Amino acid sequence: MFATLVDEIQSLDDHGVTARLRELELERRRGDAETLALITLATSRGVHRSDGHLSVAGWLRANLNWSGAQVAAAKKAARLVDSHESVGDALVDGHIGASQVGELARSARNPRCGSEIGEVLDLLLDHAEQLPYDDFRRVVRRWESLADEDGAALDADASETNRTVSAHEVDGGLDLR
């Protein structure tokens, strides 16, 4: 089968190879968008239960033979496109790819600043479309650091504030917890 496929594309000239590659990438992006839409629909309907699974994650692993990492990434991306339709539109239209959606989804799940991503999403989508992926990733990470300037310090302060200690005498010694 693969040999037949290779034989079919051998006749393409250099321009044809590039054109076909771009065509396939657009198809992949549309397919990724539809997959995320199906995951969202399946989640809201509880399709996994009718298929005998306890969770959407189990349903995805069983039906698609996905790894745990793939399942987690897809669920994050599905939540993002469900709550921010413009991301799904950009993906289905082929303006951005799965990597850009994944980076936005990761950022949207940041517990300290992810809820603010909607305020800058249009700008981030422009960057996702225009910049090479590594540059786009730096832009998103920079936005996170600016939106969460005190985040790490606040976590450290909360940890310190919430610390407790108790001392108990045990067998003539002191047990600190």
Which role does the model predict for each range below?
Residues M1-R177:
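Conserved C-terminal region and hinge/linker of Rieske [2Fe-2S] proteins, especially
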